Amino acid sequence: MAASTASQRPLKGILKDNTSTTSSMVASAEHPRGSVHEQLSKKSQKWDEMNILATYRPADKDYGLMKIDEPSTPYHSTMGDDEDACSDTETTEAMATDSLAKNLAAAEGLEPKYQVQEQESSGEEDSDLSPEEREKKRQFEMRRTLHYNEGLNIKLARQLISKDLHDDDKVEEMLETAHGESMNTEESNQGSTASDQQQNKSRSS
């Protein structure tokens, strides 16, 4: 009997609950050709959109969604008036060049203020320092200048190295030519001694 009841029960899926399978079987038995719209409306979910908007987007809160009423950058206030804008810039440039020329003429005889102040301040600082601190400062300034001049030193070293290599190449070429000439003279000397020996042999015989 247990086997017969097990065969009569419908097969259930893992994710379905008991009520959904039995209700669907009963509904299909009662309404074999029920409307699809009714079945979809039972399964579908309706959202209360106004409630969602009121909950998640209240009118009195912006949640960081501020609206900025500024123009996009770069902003030119005279974009509409092209003719006026050109004449304004020309007038401004003419005034700026005139005032700049006057300022340059007035400043020609003057020494720069920042250099004079810098020299005075360094003298005052040195007088306040102890001899040990002055020596440390002098060494620091010397190391700093060496560090800043290191790029120049590297360039000079490269030039000297390339010059030495070029000079070495010239010396090697001169040695090779001198060695070649000495070889030629030795060969000619050996040839002459061989001919002398042959002449001596011919005379003696």
Swiss-Prot record:
This is Putative protein phosphatase inhibitor 2-like protein 1. The modification Phosphoserine is found at residue 87. Belongs to the protein phosphatase inhibitor 2 family. Residues 17-26, 182-205 have a biased composition (Polar residues). Inhibitor of protein-phosphatase 1. One of its GO terms (molecular function) is protein phosphatase inhibitor activity. Keywords: Carbohydrate metabolism, Glycogen metabolism, Phosphoprotein, Protein phosphatase inhibitor. It comes from the Eukaryota. Residues 30-44, 131-144 have a biased composition (Basic and acidic residues). PANTHER family: PROTEIN PHOSPHATASE INHIBITOR, PROTEIN PHOSPHATASE INHIBITOR 2-RELATED. Residues 1-44, 64-92, 107-148, 171-205 are annotated as: Disordered. Residues 12-17, 43-55 are annotated as: Required for binding PPP1CC. Residues 147-150 are annotated as: Required for binding PPP1CC catalytic center, displacing metal ions and inhibition of PPP1CC catalytic activity. Gene3D superfamilies: 6.10.250.1050. Residues 80-91, 121-130 have a biased composition (Acidic residues). GO terms for biological process: glycogen metabolic process; intracellular signal transduction; regulation of signal transduction. It comes from Homo sapiens.
